[in-house]
Amino acid sequence: MSLIQSFKLVLSPPHRAATPFLLAGSLVGLLGRATPWRPTRLLGNAGIAFTAFCLYFFRDPKRVPPPRADLVLASADGRVTSVALVTPPAALEMGHTPVWRVSTFLSVLNVHINRMPAAGEVTKIAYHAGKFLNASFDKASEHNERNELRLTLPDGRNIGVVQIAGLIARRILCFVEEGDRVEAGERFGLIRFGSRTDVYLPPGVEPLVVEGQTMVGGETVLAKL
């Protein structure tokens, strides 16, 4: 990535989900800095710093998905922490045959917008309240707060996508509903302050990524259908 591209990424406008945090931080910053009392001014400085952090955390850069319908794309920015054959989540009703699951861990420094891995129809959404274990742990997929989606492709095959809250993340946002038709790379959700996203590939589809690889949501190719 060039220096100019890096600056464009950092300076990307924030997602609308940042609005309440930006307003709160700005208000604390302005009111705190407007008083001569030192403790209040320190609080104001903290408000300004928090606002700057939220501008960075909620950045929403433009992504350009590959113009091909036979690809599965990354659903999140971050680092691949696991590529494993597992049984899909029962709530998604994708059968009991083990499929490849690609887990991507998002640190607080990554872009946290979740994107659709392919074009299709959202045919199932299942939310589960749970714990807030470190999202990089494998057991987080079963015990943490999570939101599971089933995406049905035009050919009838299914892809599972799971948003998993982490140690710091306490709020999963999902912008789609069952019955929605979506495009590859389309924004569908966000997880605040550190998280993980799992993608379950259709049976017989092999992943093209490895553990430790850096992902770019909506652009990196996970697999070929």
UniProtKB/Swiss-Prot annotation:
Similarity-based family: Belongs to the phosphatidylserine decarboxylase family. PSD-A subfamily.
Gene name per UniProt: psd
Cofactor(s) the protein requires to work: pyruvate
NCBIfam families from the UniProt entry: PRK05305.1-3 (NF003679), PRK05305.2-5 (NF003685)
Originating species: Gluconobacter oxydans (strain 621H) (Gluconobacter suboxydans)
Record membrane topology: Peripheral membrane protein
Site (Cleavage (non-hydrolytic)): G194, S195
Subcellular location: Cell membrane
Major localization listed first in the record, in broad terms: membrane
GO MF assignments: phosphatidylserine decarboxylase activity
Record PTM Pyruvic acid (Ser), positions in chain: S195
EC number(s) recorded for this UniProt protein: 4.1.1.65
Lineage of the organism: Bacteria, Pseudomonadati, Pseudomonadota, Alphaproteobacteria, Acetobacterales
Name of the protein described by the UniProt record: Phosphatidylserine decarboxylase proenzyme
Functional note: Catalyzes the formation of phosphatidylethanolamine (PtdEtn) from phosphatidylserine (PtdSer).
